[in-house]
């Protein structure tokens, strides 16, 4: 058996689309570009393609590294590659940066052809359904009529679910990890607090901060700090940080004293250094809006009747952001429609971020599922 290996050095590719893309909001993008990466080789039948959809802070860079930046490892590198659960000896894997993103795909920092200036806050709202429509156009460009599977964790899982509804004939399997059919009110509340942190930053300038040569780093930092709290479980925080004081005793100040404070500030500063605030706003709104049951009277099983793919749904025991109950809601609705669905709840103390980690049980489960997919 081959030892798991990296896909090695990878090169992003760019696809330009001159045809306008109609959006769910009623608006349209006149033209746009998608940045993507591929791993493995497309077979002669063009039947082994797998699309990996990213979550809020992810990108097209799913696996491997860049020759000029070897430390920049793909966000799901532990899952994708030769001998890994999503084995690139068998599958042709594609990662795409979503519309509105900040990693090379057309987004708020891109130039608005109508004004010659960055889009900023004028960039149209995009939804999960819009992302999937753009991904389908990329598949057309690559000559892929049908994906063997569409895979995603968290928000990526929502995209995989939407694929089964928007293009049921173009997807064989959907793998939804740590995901949900819609956000709870609590999740929408977290997103709103994060957005307000950005919107209230004096450097936000109504979303047109590019023209002022500044970024709303303070607001974006606070938004990320809040997000990180929800990505971790109470047990994970206790095990990793506890109540440890950096100086061994209280110094009675508002500066960093507890290790958890140091961690959150570090994560916030790091995120604010590379992510775009307008992209954060757009992406959290896309999360909030996603609800395939809305047009079916709130009845999920009615919404999922259109799906024909086989499903693997995975949740994690301590994930309270996208709890196992939300995954089971998807499973029950699929079973109601007599669809083929496998479900697993993985014991993990890492919370929502478990879907990114190299957990043996989790990876064995995914490997077994992908192994039985016929291409």
UniProtKB/Swiss-Prot annotation:
Enzyme class: transferase
Active site annotation, chain numbering: 154, 319, 352
EC numbers: 2.3.1.46
Protein localization: Cytoplasm
Subunit field text: Homodimer.
Main subcellular localisation: cytoplasm
Record flagged with keyword Acyltransferase: yes
Family: Belongs to the AB hydrolase superfamily. MetX family.
Domain called AB hydrolase-1: residue spans: 48-358
Site (Important for acyl-CoA specificity): 321
Entry function: Transfers a succinyl group from succinyl-CoA to L-homoserine, forming succinyl-L-homoserine.
Protein's pathway: Amino-acid biosynthesis; L-methionine biosynthesis via de novo pathway; O-succinyl-L-homoserine from L-homoserine: step 1/1
Single GO MF descriptor: homoserine O-acetyltransferase activity
SUPFAM superfamilies tied to this protein: alpha/beta-Hydrolases
Protein name stated in the entry: Homoserine O-succinyltransferase
Species: Aromatoleum aromaticum (strain DSM 19018 / LMG 30748 / EbN1) (Azoarcus sp. (strain EbN1))
Parts of the chain that traverse the membrane: none
Keywords: Acyltransferase, Amino-acid biosynthesis, Cytoplasm, Methionine biosynthesis, Transferase
Catalytic activity: L-homoserine + succinyl-CoA = O-succinyl-L-homoserine + CoA
Domain of life: Bacteria
């Amino acid at each position: 058996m081959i030892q798991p290996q990296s896909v090695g050095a990878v090169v992003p590719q760019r696809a330009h689309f001159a045809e306008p893309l109609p959006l769910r909001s009623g608006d349209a993008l006149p033209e746009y570009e998608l940045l993507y990466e591929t791993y493995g080789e497309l077979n002669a039948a063009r039947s082994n393609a797998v699309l990996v959809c990213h979550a809020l802070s992810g990108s097209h860079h799913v696996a491997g590294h860049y020759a000029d930046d070897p430390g920049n490892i793909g966000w799901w590198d532990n899952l994708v590659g030769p001998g890994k659960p999503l084995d690139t000896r068998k599958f042709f894997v594609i990662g795409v940066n979503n519309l509105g993103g900040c990693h090379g795909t057309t987004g708020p920092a891109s130039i608005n052809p109508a004004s010659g200036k960055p889009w900023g806050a004028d960039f149209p709202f995009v939804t999960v359904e819009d992302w999937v429509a753009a991904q389908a156009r990329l598949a057309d460009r690559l000559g892929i009529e049908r994906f063997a599977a569409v895979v995603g964790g968290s928000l990526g899982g929502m995209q995989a679910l939407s694929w089964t509804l928007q293009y049921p004939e173009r997807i064989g399997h959907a793998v939804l990890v740590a995901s949900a059919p819609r956000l709870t009110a609590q999740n929408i509340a977290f997103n709103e607090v994060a957005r307000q942190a950005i919107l209230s930053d004096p450097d936000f300038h109504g979303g047109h901060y590019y023209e002022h040569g500044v970024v709303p780093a303070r607001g974006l930092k606070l938004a990320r700090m809040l997000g990180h709290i929800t990505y971790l479980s109470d047990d994970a925080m206790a095990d990793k940080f506890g109540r440890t004081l950096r100086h061994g005793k209280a110094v009675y100040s508002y500066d960093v004293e507890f290790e958890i404070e140091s961690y959150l500030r570090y994560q916030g500063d790091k995120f604010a250094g590379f992510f775009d605030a307008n992209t954060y706003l757009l992406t959290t709104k896309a999360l909030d809006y996603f609800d395939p049951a809305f047009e079916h009277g709130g009845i999920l099983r009615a919404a999922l009747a259109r799906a024909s793919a086989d499903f693997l749904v995975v949740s994690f025991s301590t994930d309270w952001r996208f709890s196992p109950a939300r995954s089971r809601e998807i499973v029950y609705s699929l079973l109601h429609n007599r669809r083929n669905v496998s479900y697993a709840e993985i014991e993990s103390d890492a919370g929502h971020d478990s879907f990114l980690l190299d957990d043996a049980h989790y990876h064995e489960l995914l490997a077994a599922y992908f192994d039985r997919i016929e291409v």
